[in-house]
Design a protein with these regions (language model features):
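Active-site-proximal beta-alpha core segment in soluble small-molecule metabolic enzymes
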Residues: 1-166
Length: 166
């Protein structure tokens, strides 16, 4: 997925869409732009925090995969759109420090977003009980990384969590 907020350029979105890349949107404007550019349904990921109800409504209307930022968003989303989609994702924040080798990349523990490890287990239990069938995990643990070492380290952490959640 391409983070639309990085470069909300219709021409770039068009090229990336043609190569099969979806859009990661963090606002109503980005959702509308991606949808207008022909990116549809599950090819749009909606990841936002402090989300107004009308943005959840629009994301659901266009079939975007909604990535919940907080455990309280489960009830808020259900009340807002009247149901929970069959596919939902949750943003994970493991807390502590995120490091590669001896370098501290960032401090997710200080971040304002994401489910804690305990909330991931509770959230997925709630979602499953409410009929959600497909689950995604999203995380963003460091900004402005300058090497590719970040990605396999993050992937390992997410896959280890997925195995535990199963």
């Amino acid at each position: 997925f391409f983070a639309v907020k990085a470069t909300p350029n219709p021409f770039l979105i068009n090229i990336l869409r043609d190569y099969g890349c979806g859009c990661d949107c963090s606002s109503l404007t980005e959702l509308m732009l991606s949808n207008a550019m022909g990116v549809k349904g599950e090819d749009i990921m909606f990841s936002s925090n402090d989300t107004p109800a009308h943005e959840f409504e629009y994301a659901a209307k266009i079939g975007a995969t909604i990535n919940l930022d907080d455990i309280t968003h489960i009830d808020f989303l259900e009340k807002t759109i009247g149901y929970l989609p069959k596919t939902l994702s949750c943003r994970y924040n493991p807390g502590g420090y995120f490091s590669i080798s001896n370098n501290i990349m960032d401090n997710p523990g200080d971040a304002k977003y994401g489910f804690t490890t305990e909330q991931m287990f509770e959230g997925y239990k709630i979602l499953k009980a409410k009929g959600v069938e497909n689950f995604g995990i999203h995380s963003f643990l460091a900004s402005n990384t300058v090497t590719n070492d970040y990605y396999p380290t993050l992937a390992r952490e997410l896959f280890e969590l997925a195995v535990k959640l199963k």
